[in-house]
């Protein structure tokens, strides 16, 4: 008896009879000669039928099965997995994957089987808490989480896209003060907020704001005039450290400047009195800021919207009530400006009904 997720089980789903192979991670590829493929139909502990096939697909069984059982549970669907579905399920979890298909083609089912497969075969890399399932409504999410145990999957977190972005705002979100409203997709202004162009505008806004907040002038040591940091170094550092927030860059630049200062005043001919040295050290410790940005993400977002209006891209200004794209923008501002101690979130996100969300949401998640 073999688990359907085991590497050798791919032989059943992917191959016709005859010479074929399967691959086991870290052990290599094994060649075999597949003599027979047989599928059994068992109902109430009785063998009802069986099918021999020398082709890959299980179309005959699938058609018969779905015709008599419109409410199939996931554990029973395993027997009817098709070759293309199997390839999706078993694809490496290291890359992004988009599954496209008509309504009712099994996209959600394949996604759930894929989670089960990854947890089984990559147990050293992934745990249930590494997964988020994102859906457009709670009804669908509740269904997904209720049936995942049939695939031996437990502890997967699920939430709407709005809830995900709120989660990424951490302590800045006050549920007693702020509300969430459903986006009106028929409103043309909302389609503007959901596009890539809107994200690029927000990205440029953050870049400009950061340049205004972090001093770019050369830093020279008082008394000697020795150059500690030049403008080019500061500019290059801010550009290269793209994963750090503005607050994080300020903290790191302070540390770099302080190290340069300590190196310069140690063992040099020009000596500094202890009091003067202490005062300079205190100054350079906070030269780029005291390590805590004290602005408001929400005020900054309103500032961005005002700039957009000046460019002829006016949208409704939220008054403590936000739609999914407002929340996406707020989460991005938090990440770019304020985040200084990143919290480990999911490493694998499954988004159901992905077409319901504009590129703004995906650009922010990326």
State where each predicted segment sits.
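Conserved lysine of the Walker
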Residues: 107-108
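Pre-Walker A adenine-sensing motif
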Residues: 79-91, 336
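Hydrophobic anchor at the beta1->P-loop junction of P-loop NTPases
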Residues: 99-101
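Post-Walker A alpha-helix
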Residues: 111-112
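N-terminal accessory nucleic-acid engagement/regulatory domains that precede
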Residues: 1-64
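Walker A (P-loop) phosphate-binding loop of P-loop NTPases
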Residues: 104
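Pre-Walker A (Motif I) flank of P-loop NTPase domains
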Residues: 93-97
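Alpha-helical nucleic-acid-binding subdomain
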Residues: 119-349, 355-364
């Amino acid at each position: 008896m073999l688990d359907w997720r085991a590497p050798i089980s791919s032989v059943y789903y992917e191959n016709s009879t005859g010479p074929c192979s399967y691959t086991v991670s870290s052990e290599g590829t094994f060649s075999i000669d597949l003599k027979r493929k047989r599928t059994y139909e068992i109902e109430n502990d009785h063998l009802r039928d069986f099918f021999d096939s020398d082709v890959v697909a299980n179309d005959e069984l699938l058609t018969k099965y779905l015709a008599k059982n419109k409410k199939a549970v996931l554990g029973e669907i395993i027997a009817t997995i098709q070759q293309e579905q199997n390839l999706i399920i078993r694809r490496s979890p290291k890359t992004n994957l988009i599954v496209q298909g008509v309504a009712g083609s099994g996209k959600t089912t394949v996604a759930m089987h894929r989670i089960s497969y990854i947890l089984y075969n990559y147990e050293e890399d992934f745990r249930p808490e590494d997964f988020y399932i994102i859906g457009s409504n709670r009804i669908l999410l509740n269904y997904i989480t209720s049936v995942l145990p049939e695939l031996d999957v437990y502890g997967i977190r699920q939430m709407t896209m709005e809830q995900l972005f709120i989660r990424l705002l951490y302590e800045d979100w006050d549920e007693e003060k702020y509300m969430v409203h459903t986006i009106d997709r028929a409103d043309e202004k909302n389609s503007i907020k959901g596009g890539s162009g809107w994200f690029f505008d927000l990205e440029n806004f953050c870049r400009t704001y950061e340049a205004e907040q972090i001093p770019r002038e050369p830093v020279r040591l008082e008394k000697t005039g020795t150059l500690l940091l030049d403008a080019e170094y500061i500019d290059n550092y801010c550009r290269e450290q793209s994963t750090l927030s503005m607050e994080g860059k300020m903290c790191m630049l302070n540390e770099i400047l302080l190290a340069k200062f300590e190196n310069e005043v140690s063992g040099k001919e020009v000596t500094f009195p202890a009091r003067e040295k202490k005062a300079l050290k205190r100054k350079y410790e906070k030269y780029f800021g005291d390590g805590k940005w004290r602005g408001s993400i929400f005020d900054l977002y309103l500032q961005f919207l005002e700039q957009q209006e000046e460019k002829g891209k006016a949208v409704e200004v939220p008054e403590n009530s936000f739609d999914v794209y407002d929340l996406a923008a707020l989460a991005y501002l938090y990440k770019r400006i304020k985040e200084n101690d990143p919290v480990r979130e999911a490493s694998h996100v499954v988004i159901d009904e992905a077409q319901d969300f504009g590129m703004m949401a995906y650009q922010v998640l990326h």
